Amino acid sequence: MAHWRTPSRIFLVGPMGAGKSTVGRELANLLGLEFIDSDAAIEARTGVSIPWIFDIEGEAGFRAREAAVIDELTGRDGVVVATGGGAVTTPANRDLLGARGVVVYLYTPVSVQLQRTRHDTNRPLLQSDDPEARLQSLLAERDPLYREVADVVVETTGGRARSVARRIVEALQGQPS
């Protein structure tokens, strides 16, 4: 059996509350790669918060900034990148993610997303009267896009971040190189 080689670029996609940042850090640790959160990179580059960008520039302005960061981050080697939940809504992002690395979709049911995000005020798309309905709507819209771009799908329920990261490694080891 051939020795498995760690991919040099792993991109995590999935809805808010999937654990992309938490699991991404664990995965990077396990594989000896650098972890980068695309939302944190946007905030570092702009010097302002994601909610501020949404308030001032709207979602379209944020998506334009996100696309530039995704383009940059997907060109780096030795990284695990956690993308924002809506990154896949931009066709160019899907193309870059799929062409430049291995994409892992962290599938998470809405009930779990809601539990994980209910007290987080740093999520502009959840500032609604009915966050659960909003999450349902976003998942219905984005799940096909996550699946389209994903090389592997790993469910994030029923385990701590480290065990999810281990399941990702196992799933990646089963992928053709």
Swiss-Prot record:
It catalyses: shikimate + ATP = 3-phosphoshikimate + ADP + H(+). Mg(2+) binds at S21. ATP binds at G17, A18, G19, K20, S21, T22, R123, R160. It is found in: Cytoplasm. InterPro entries: P-loop_NTPase, Shikimate/glucono_kinase, Shikimate_kinase/TSH1, Shikimate_kinase_CS. One of its GO terms (molecular function) is shikimate kinase activity. Its cofactor is Mg(2+). Coiled coil: none annotated. Signal peptide: none annotated. HAMAP family: Shikimate_kinase. Monomer. PANTHER family: SHIKIMATE KINASE, SHIKIMATE KINASE 1, CHLOROPLASTIC. This is Shikimate kinase. It comes from Halorhodospira halophila (strain DSM 244 / SL1).
